[in-house]
């Protein structure tokens, strides 16, 4: 069903859900409009009320806070929707940056817009775009991915799915997983250009620019602290063409043997070769085992 929202000229019996960005490190990045909105709404739904309370104290915001995070989003979200339906205005904030981006909030936005509610976004701080524009890597087109899976095996699967994308790719990463993630990127994406940023907008803001292998060298020698944003160069046409054609001169048997030489079992190698060739595994299996 089509739903039209005239944010400032429309009429609605329900309240408005405001999506209010908060600073990603430097408190001076809080906008006048964000402060005014947080002061004027009936309640602030916060990912971490303790963190938001500190922000409110700085700007003398006395609006009541309600907890809304990943572990209570269903129960708290239902309560917030009921408040909105009754005509109350609610502001949604995350700990830092824009709500719903690698943070809870997308569900409540969908639920409220599905019933015709007005959702008004405010512009403001965002770590991904802040890192991108200063990365030195082509800023557009870009693809924002956020956090990779914490499990090493699943992380590699995700990178495999991303390796042919030609857009600049933006990731978030925690300090204790940075080295493992960089190693997985080097293995799967190759030695591309990358900009690693940490402590954006804070006193110790830092950019580390270079190839993935160079950044791995830095990570092995430096102390890893802070929250990281990684801006990675996309694939180029030559890389894609080379990847698609490298095996074309090989027989199916030689193709399987190539993967076995890289450490794969015969079963894994047959599966990989079948995927490359876009043929049934049985066809590759038969070709590999002939005359053996």
UniProtKB/Swiss-Prot annotation:
Q: What reaction gets catalysed by this protein?
A: cytidine(1402) in 16S rRNA + S-adenosyl-L-methionine = 2'-O-methylcytidine(1402) in 16S rRNA + S-adenosyl-L-homocysteine + H(+)
Name the Enzyme Commission number(s) assigned to this protein. 2.1.1.198
Specify the superkingdom: Bacteria
Compartment(s) of residence: Cytoplasm
The UniProt entry lists the main location of this chain as cytoplasm
Matching entries from PROSITE patterns are given as: RSMI
**What InterPro entries is this protein classified in?**
4pyrrol_Mease, 4pyrrol_Methylase_sf, 4pyrrole_Mease_sub1, 4pyrrole_Mease_sub2, rRNA_ssu_MeTfrase_I, SAM_MeTrfase_RsmI_CS
UniProt-listed Pfam families: TP_methylase (PF00590)
Gene Ontology molecular function: rRNA (cytosine-2'-O-)-methyltransferase activity
Q: Which GO terms describe its cellular component?
A: cytoplasm
Give UniProt keywords alphabetically: Cytoplasm, Methyltransferase, rRNA processing, S-adenosyl-L-methionine, Transferase
Protein family according to the UniProt entry: Belongs to the methyltransferase superfamily. RsmI family.
Cited function: Catalyzes the 2'-O-methylation of the ribose of cytidine 1402 (C1402) in 16S rRNA.
Q: Which HAMAP family match?
A: 16SrRNA_methyltr_I
| Entry protein name | Ribosomal RNA small subunit methyltransferase I
Q: Which gene encodes it?
A: rsmI
């Amino acid at each position: 069903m089509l739903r039209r929202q005239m944010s400032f000229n429309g009429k609605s019996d329900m309240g408005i859900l405001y999506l209010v960005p908060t600073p990603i490190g430097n408190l001076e990045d809080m906008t006048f409009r964000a402060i005014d909105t947080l002061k004027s709404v009936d309640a602030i739904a916060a990912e971490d009320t303790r963190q938001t309370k500190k922000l409110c104290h700085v700007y003398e915001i006395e609006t009541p806070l309600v907890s809304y995070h990943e572990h209570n989003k269903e129960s708290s979200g239902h309560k917030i929707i009921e408040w909105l339906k009754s005509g109350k205005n609610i502001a949604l904030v995350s700990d830092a940056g824009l709500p719903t981006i690698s943070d809870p909030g997308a569900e409540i936005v969908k639920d409220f817009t599905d019933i015709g509610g007005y959702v008004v976004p405010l512009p403001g701080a965002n770590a991904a775009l802040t890192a991108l524009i200063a990365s030195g890597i082509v800023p557009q087109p870009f693809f924002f991915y956020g956090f990779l899976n914490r499990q090493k095996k699943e992380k590699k699967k995700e990178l495999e799915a991303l390796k042919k994308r030609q857009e600049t790719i933006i990731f978030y990463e925690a300090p204790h997983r940075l080295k493992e993630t960089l190693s997985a990127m080097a293995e799967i994406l190759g030695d591309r250009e990358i900009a690693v940023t940490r402590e954006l907008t804070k006193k110790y803001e830092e950019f580390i620019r270079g190839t993935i292998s160079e950044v791995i060298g830095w990570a092995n020698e430096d102390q890893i602290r802070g929250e990281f944003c990684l801006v990675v160069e996309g694939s180029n046409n030559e890389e894609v063409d080379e990847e698609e054609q490298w095996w074309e001169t090989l027989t199916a048997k030689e193709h399987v043997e190539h993967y076995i030489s890289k450490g794969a079992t015969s079963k894994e190698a047959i599966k990989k070769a079948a995927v490359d060739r876009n043929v049934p595994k049985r066809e590759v299996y038969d070709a590999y085992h002939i005359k053996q």
